[in-house]
Structure formats: structure tokens, C-alpha cells
């Protein structure tokens, strides 16, 4: 299974309950991946990749994630940490790396803004920084 490194930088909007200046170091163990090869054979625009897994902090499971990418178009992701989540969306070109905008969240991340950078590597790592 392909693995990704993800760095989340979150700007806390007014009313966001999570403390600004907080940094969370998370890792993901991918539990599923599905690939739909649309159009031209092999990876090409319009193909759909869906994957997700369990999210850990200091070796303890704290949540899960789900990511759906359309090659050459958009990538939509949601990372749940406890009862709260972060939502990110953005353009993803062919290849393992992209940057997306954090467009909101739920619970203590409600109103969150920032960016998420994704780079393909052997393991998935999340770094969440709350600033504001």
C-alpha cells in the first residue's frame, strides 16, 4: 500500500476551542486503499484513489482518516482526532505530492483554517500546528 506523509498547519479562527500554538505529532497506519483506473490505462487524470487508516499519537490510537483523490483534479480529506475533525480540500496533480487548504473542522477544530502538505513516503506522518 502506498503511504503518505502529511503536515497539517492550522490557523485557529475566532471561536476555535483548540489552543493556538499547539503542535500534534500524529502517524497513520493505512488500513485500506482502493484505486479506480478510469480512461487511459495506468495512472491518469480522472482516476480515483480512496484510502484511510488509523491515526496514532505517541503509539496510542487517537482517531482515523479518510482521503479521496481524483488524479488531476481534487483531493478531499477528513482526519478525526477523538470527537473532532479537520477537513482539507485541494488540487492534486499526477504524483504523490500536493498541498491542500484546511477548510474547516468539527468540535474543537470548528472554523479551522490552514494548509495540509502531502508527500509520498514509506509511512504517513501528520504534524498539526494550531496558530492564530
Language-model-derived ranges and their functions:
Residues 20-132:
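Beta-strand-enriched cores of mature, soluble protein domains
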Residues 4-13:
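Sec-dependent N-terminal signal peptides
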Residues 12-22:
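Bacterial Sec-dependent signal peptides at the C-terminal "C-region" and cleavage site
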Amino acid at each position: 500500500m502506498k503511504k503518505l506523509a502529511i503536515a497539517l498547519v492550522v490557523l485557529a479562527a475566532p471561536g476555535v476551542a483548540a489552543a493556538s500554538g499547539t503542535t500534534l505529532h500524529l502517524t497513520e497506519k493505512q488500513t485500506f486503499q482502493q484505486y479506480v483506473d478510469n480512461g487511459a490505462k495506468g495512472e491518469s487524470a480522472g482516476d480515483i484513489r480512496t484510502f484511510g487508516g488509523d491515526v496514532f499519537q505517541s503509539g496510542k490510537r487517537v482517531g482515523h482518516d479518510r482521503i479521496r483523490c481524483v488524479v488531476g483534479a481534487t483531493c478531499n480529506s477528513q482526519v478525526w482526532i477523538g470527537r473532532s475533525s479537520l477537513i482539507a480540500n485541494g488540487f492534486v496533480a499526477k504524483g504523490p505530492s500536493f498541498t491542500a487548504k484546511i477548510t474547516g473542522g468539527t468540535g474543537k477544530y470548528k472554523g479551522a483554517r490552514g494548509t495540509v502538505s502531502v508527500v509520498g513516503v514509506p509511512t504517513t506522518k501528520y504534524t498539526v500546528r494550531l496558530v492564530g
